[in-house]
UniProtKB/Swiss-Prot annotation:
GO molecular function: structural constituent of ribosome
Keywords noted in UniProt: Ribonucleoprotein, Ribosomal protein
Pfam families, alphabetized: Ribosomal_L30
Entry similarity comment: Belongs to the universal ribosomal protein uL30 family.
UniProt-listed GO biological process terms: translation
CDD domains per the UniProt record, alphabetical: Ribosomal_L30
Entry GO CC: cytosolic large ribosomal subunit
Name recorded for this polypeptide: Large ribosomal subunit protein uL30
Native organism: Cereibacter sphaeroides (strain ATCC 17023 / DSM 158 / JCM 6121 / CCUG 31486 / LMG 2827 / NBRC 12203 / NCIMB 8253 / ATH 2.4.1.) (Rhodobacter sphaeroides)
Superkingdom, natural source: Bacteria
Subunit structure: Part of the 50S ribosomal subunit.
Amino acid sequence: MAKTIIVKQVRSAARRPAVQTAVLKGLGLNKMHRTRELEDTPSIRGMVAKIPHLVEIIEERG
């Protein structure tokens, strides 16, 4: 079983640079307070690290 993380969007993407909006879209997040369970890979961790002010990691499983 692969390790997973649960990511929650805590701030809006409105009036943010296009790069940050694209990262949110890549994570599957598009509205505030939505959560996604994602595979814990270096690429996902890198995406989360680019927008720490917009998302938070709620839980790490595995």
